[in-house]
Structures are given as structure tokens and as C-alpha cells.
Amino acid sequence: MSGIFLLHQTKMKKIAIQGIKGSFHDIATHQYFKGEDIELICCDTFEKVFDEMRHEGSLFALVAIENTIAGSLLHNYELLLESGLTVVGEHKLQIEHSIMCLPEDDWDTLSEVNSHPVALMQCYRFLKNHPGLRVVEDDDTAGAAEHISSRHLKGHAAICHKDAAPLYGLKVLEEGIQDNKHNFTRFLVLTDPWNADLVRDARLCNKCSLVFSLPDDEGCLSQVLSIFSFYKINLTKIQSLPIIGREWEYLFYIDVTYDDYVRFHQSLDAIKPLTRELKNLGEYVAKK
């Protein structure tokens, strides 16, 4: 079931993602919007995703925000805050890597493997066991598969999701080559604030992303966390980023879950006097 509660099921939705068909963003988007009529707007970079959102307010975006191995995508936090977009959902995708090549190639004809640097890092042990393969970084996992296919690069292999193979006419040599089998990426679903209430039911929301800064006073952060604890608000993530141009000052991005919507908003009222620049980035349904 989709994590988004749509009131207009028949209208096709346009979703901006970083990457191309067969990328992990593509796979996560189709899982999240399963059963819905969607059109992908594929962008080379995350900056271009947010540019698309600025130009057309009715769009959605699905953007990776953290990985259980690589950690947080810090720049995406900055892009989210600058954009003014609202978080209306999240999706967690298990990251599974496969190695694929042209149909006429095989292990004994391969000389080079291409993929995104993070994917290559996540397959370190596999690559170490194949020292004959020269490792070359690419901008995108599925993009590496597309390049091999479109340019008919014999002797080249791509590391990406297995779903990219049929899209680009490649054959899978081995699946599940990632070092850690418990590798997950969390994605946020974003849209313009005016569009948010059309696509979610606030009564069902139980998670919120917030950002704030704090004065340089002793114990400020612990006071904020104590207030959340008093109102039985569960902190699921905290991420600090330096504020550019303000030495040793930080923005705190936090995710919280709650059972009582009223008590959650009471907690926000209680922490507001303690914080600076408190902003609600969006309320949505927590995905397990």
C-alpha cells in the first residue's frame, strides 16, 4: 500500500527523481506509488530535481536522504530547506546490487566494471575477489548499464539493481553482490505545500521532520529533548549541519514519531521559545 493518501487517484502524477530508469530512485518511486499512474522526470543531479519542483508546483519528488551504510546525504538536507517543499511521505528500499554485462560477454571476457562510487564502495569485498576487473566510477548505477548497452561496450560490466538488466538488454552474472545484506536507503516524498493537503490525510500522520537552530546557551538541546520526552514524542533521527557564515552554529534536523497529534503540536509550542528558526518540514506516515 502506498504511504501517501491520495484524494485524486485518477490523475497522473509527475515525479522528479535523480537518475534514470532502472536506478534505485526509479525502483523506490514505483514501489511507493504502486498501482498509480505516474510519469518520471529523470534528472542528472539532485539540484535539477529541485529546479524542476520550482518550475512546476504540481510535481512530486522522491529524494534519497540517508543510507544505513553511507549515512546521511547532507547536501539534500540543505536543498530541502532552501526549496520550501513539504515532506508528505517516506519510503525505505533495500539496496541490492547485481553485476551485468552484454549478452555475448562473460566472466572471462570482462576487463572493467562501472558504477556509482557509493555502489562500488558497497561491493568492496566482491571487487576485491575479482582483481582482474578495473574499477571505473560512473555518475549513476543504472547510467552505467545504459552506457554499456547504448555504446555496446564489450568487456565492460555494470553494478546496479537487477531490474536495469531487461531495460538495457544486459544479462545478470551475479545478484546480491553487496557486502552488507542489511543495506537500506530512506527516501523522502516531497511536494509544494499547497499540494500537500490534497495528497495526505493529516489524521493518519504519525511522523514529522523538523529543523531548528539553538542559542549558545548551556543545556538548550537537552531541554528540547526533555520536552519531547515529556510529551511522549519519540526522536528517531538527529542530524546537525553547520550554518554557513555563522561560525560554530548549527542547524538540527530531527525526525520524530508520535501517537497523539494534539500532544505533538503541544510539544512544538513548548520548544518554540527555546529554539531559533523552528520549521516544520512536513508531517507524514512513518514507514517501517
Regions found by a protein language model. Give the residues of each.
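Domain-level signature for soluble enzymes in the chorismate/prephenate branch of the shikimate pathway
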Residues: 1-288
